[in-house]
């Protein structure tokens, strides 16, 4: 029998959820730490065995999952005294739309994205040379790279993509990404920048939508990342389940923390906001603001969409320790 070492925590979590979904709350919020392995060449901050610290939300189809994960991860980094880092964010649907718009065939997307992922190392000219060297039409390559020169790294860049990629990019994908960026920017606790990066690819082929990475100048690269993987659990159950995760490299963070001192904050009673589905962004921002204040006060806070069987949902929350529950309605 062939054997292998665990590559990440996402696949095992998906398998666990697939086997126990009926016993778990929905959405299911998981926090885990564990060792994983890579066939990498060891160097500063890069190891063949290292520990990942993951937070995931399974069963939540809306972008509330992305907003919560990014806010939670960046709040943690802020409490560890990290400042002026960048959350680079993109969406796999943007990558595919830009490739289609430029004339690349769908079967060539993976190859094109592998080259695009080298943008930080070889630059625009290097990417152009490699794509042409791989036999892609010069017209497609030039049209493709012209997009990256035109698109800005903010919400205006997202809006430009929505306008320019009509017929290739679903408008709701652009609207969702813009909402994530603006919501996080308005509610963030730490000092960091949200940057729309249309060149961000991330290597995991299982991502289906939003993808993001944490970049720190003092490290010279990424210290964490994640994204949406709505098709993963369906491989085990036959039914797709929405899921988003964010992972931080423990050793990389500790390596940077060794230069400073830090004390773990004490925890206080848990609080849950039970919100009506399809809550307007303005109302959602109010909830996120209140949750931020509660977290600043040292409380563990959960925001979850209201279900039809509210009584059972509250019982589940109580079992998880959320005894202080606030219901939020549109009106």
Task: Give short role names for the model-derived ranges.
Residues 84-94, 112, 195-201:
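Short, surface-exposed recognition loops or helix-turn segments adjacent to catalytic cores
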Residues 47-53, 89-97:
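Short, conserved phosphate-binding/catalytic loop or strand-edge motifs used
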Residues 74-78, 94-101:
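Hydrophobic mid-domain F-helix/FG-region of cytochrome P450s
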Residues 22-31, 81-87, 106, 110:
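Short secondary-structure capping/junction motifs at helix and strand boundaries
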Residues 1, 104-127:
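Acidic, His- and aromatic-enriched active-site or binding-groove loops in soluble protein domains
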Residues 8-21, 30-82, 131-331:
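Positively charged, Gly/Ser-enriched RNA/tRNA-binding surfaces
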Residues 2, 86-87, 245:
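A residue-level structural signature of the nucleotidyltransferase/glycosyltransferase Rossmann-like core
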């Amino acid at each position: 029998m062939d054997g292998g070492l665990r590559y990440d925590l996402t696949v095992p979590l998906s398998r666990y959820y697939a086997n126990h979904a009926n016993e778990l709350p929905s959405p299911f919020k998981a926090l885990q730490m564990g060792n994983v392995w890579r066939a990498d060449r060891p160097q500063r901050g890069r190891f063949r065995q290292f520990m990942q610290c993951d937070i995931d939300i399974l069963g939540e189809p809306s972008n509330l999952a992305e907003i919560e994960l990014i806010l939670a991860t960046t709040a943690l980094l802020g409490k560890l005294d990290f400042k002026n880092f960048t959350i680079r964010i993109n969406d796999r649907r943007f990558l595919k739309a830009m490739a289609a718009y430029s004339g690349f065939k769908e079967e060539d997307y993976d190859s094109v994205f592998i080259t695009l992922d080298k943008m930080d190392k070889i630059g625009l000219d290097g990417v152009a040379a490699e794509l042409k060297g791989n036999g892609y039409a010069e017209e497609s390559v030039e049209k493709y790279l012209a997009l990256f020169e035109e698109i800005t790294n903010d919400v205006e860049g997202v809006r430009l993509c929505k306008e320019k990629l009509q017929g290739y990019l679903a408008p709701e994908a652009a609207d969702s990404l813009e909402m994530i960026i603006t919501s996080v920017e308005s509610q963030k606790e730490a000092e960091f920048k949200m940057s729309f990066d249309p060149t961000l690819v991330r290597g995991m082929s299982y991502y289906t939508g939003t993808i993001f990475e944490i970049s720190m100048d003092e490290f010279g690269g990424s210290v964490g990342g994640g994204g949406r993987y709505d098709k993963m659990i369906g491989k085990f159950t036959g039914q797709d389940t929405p899921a988003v995760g964010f992972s931080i490299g423990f050793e990389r963070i500790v390596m940077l923390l060794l230069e400073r001192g830090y004390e773990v904050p004490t925890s206080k009673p848990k609080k849950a906001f039970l919100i009506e589905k399809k809550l307007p962004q303005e109302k959602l921002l109010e909830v996120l603001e209140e949750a931020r204040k509660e977290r600043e006060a040292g409380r563990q806070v959960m925001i979850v969409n209201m279900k039809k069987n509210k009584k059972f949902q509250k019982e589940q929350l109580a079992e998880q320790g959320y005894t202080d529950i606030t219901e939020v309605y549109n009106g």
